[in-house]
Amino acid sequence: MVDDGPKGRQQLKLLLVAARHQLSGQDLRGLVHYLEREDLGFEVTLQVADPTQQPELLELHRLVVTPALIKLQPSPKQVFAGSNILQQLKGWVPRWKQDGVVSGLGLSLRPTELDGSRTQKELQLEDQLLVLRQENETLIDRIHAQERLLRMVAHELRTPLTAAALALQSQRLGQIDMDRFQDVVTRRLEEMEALSKDLLEVGTTRWETLFNPQRLDLASVSAEVILELEKLWLGRNVEIRTDIPSDLPKVFADQRRMRQVLLNLLENALKYTGNGGHIALSMLHRTNQWVEVSVCDSGPGIPNEEQQRIFLDRVRLPQTSDRTTGFGVGLSVCRRIVEVHGGRIWVVSEPEEGACFTFTVPIWQGQGQEWGQAVLTEGQADP
């Protein structure tokens, strides 16, 4: 909560509706800093609410996307949403101050000339136009969020289907027994059931509800992923190297989503690594805030001009051989997941020397207990 300014000033009550991972974003951290440090001419009160804990706020304030900042007082209520909440707020504060001065003097503005040639009616129309533009931007954000979620979930559906198909093939060839086969299929069906619930959530555009960050052993998750992909690399004489320190700290992340990122990166590495090649999975913690995960391969590499584009939505690079189909939506999904966790993802590659994808994950620091302070003070990972 922010309480700014001497008593006796007009109250400015704000409600910030944002999930835990959103509070670490640059815009919201800048917003809190602005409210704490700047003299806005109001007695400022800021409350923070997590929509995953208080979903009724989304309906109460008719929010279609978060994060959102709501001005509760002075009336009328206003809602700011999107990726530039701070700039929107800075644009409106002077207007609120002017309205407060006029109200304090007991004046009632009429359609008389203001600011030289602009009438009060014109100013009101301008304000209404700004509100309409804001609502339009919010709707556009909602549509884009729905598209991203649909692509993410649709892409993720391939993983359990592929695993179930491989298990069926292995069982027919006598490589696994019936108990092992049933165990694999059962777990994959459970995954698809969870994904079907995600698809239902897409219609509400509540991205944060698809993530459940918690204390997580990333080394164990990576071991499960490597075992799951075993059939893909054993038959091709591809060596998998791992470098994971025994003292690797636990991370604060969603288990399903981290598994999805590792699967995507390792599948891409296997796709582009030829027979007899190698893939390296490494994890390290250079600071007390971030674990750095790298997946490197000995494939053909990625052209310099494409290394930024591969993380964009709807970008698919041309295939490099009959066996590969090009980097698709998987990398854009990885980027979204990593960024929602507050981290970064990037690639280092040279032609004919392979590619190395690296992403960062926040270290567990009791976020589930005191998440408010933790995420507000947490910065972005260094490259």
UniProtKB/Swiss-Prot annotation:
Residues 152-365 form the Histidine kinase domain. SMART domains: HATPase_c, HisKA, KaiB. One of its GO terms (molecular function) is phosphorelay sensor kinase activity. Keywords: ATP-binding, Biological rhythms, Kinase, Nucleotide-binding, Phosphoprotein, Transferase, Two-component regulatory system. It is an enzyme of class 2 (transferase). Its EC number is 2.7.13.3. The modification Phosphohistidine is found at H155. InterPro entries: HATPase_C_sf, His_kinase_dom, HisK_dim/P_dom, HisK_dim/P_sf, KaiB_domain, Kinase_SasA, Sig_transdc_His_kin-like_C, Thioredoxin-like_sf. Pfam families: HATPase_c, HisKA, KaiB. GO terms for biological process: circadian rhythm. It catalyses: ATP + protein L-histidine = ADP + protein N-phospho-L-histidine. Homooligomerizes. Interacts with KaiC. Participates in the KaiABC clock complex, whose core is composed of a KaiC homohexamer, 6 KaiB and up to 6 KaiA dimers. SasA and KaiB(fs) compete to bind to KaiC. The N-terminus interacts with KaiC, while the C-terminal histidine kinase domain autophosphorylates and is probably responsible for self-oligomerization. The N-terminal domain stimulates the C-terminus to autophosphorylate. Member of the two-component regulatory system SasA/RpaA involved in genome-wide circadian gene expression. One of several clock output pathways. Participates in the Kai clock protein complex, the main circadian regulator in cyanobacteria, via its interaction with KaiC. KaiC enhances the autophosphorylation activity of SasA, which then transfers its phosphate group to RpaA to activate it. In addition to its output function, recruits fold-shifted KaiB (KaiB(fs)) to KaiC to cooperatively form the KaiB(6):KaiC(6) complex (independent of SasA kinase activity). This is Adaptive-response sensory kinase SasA. The gene is sasA.
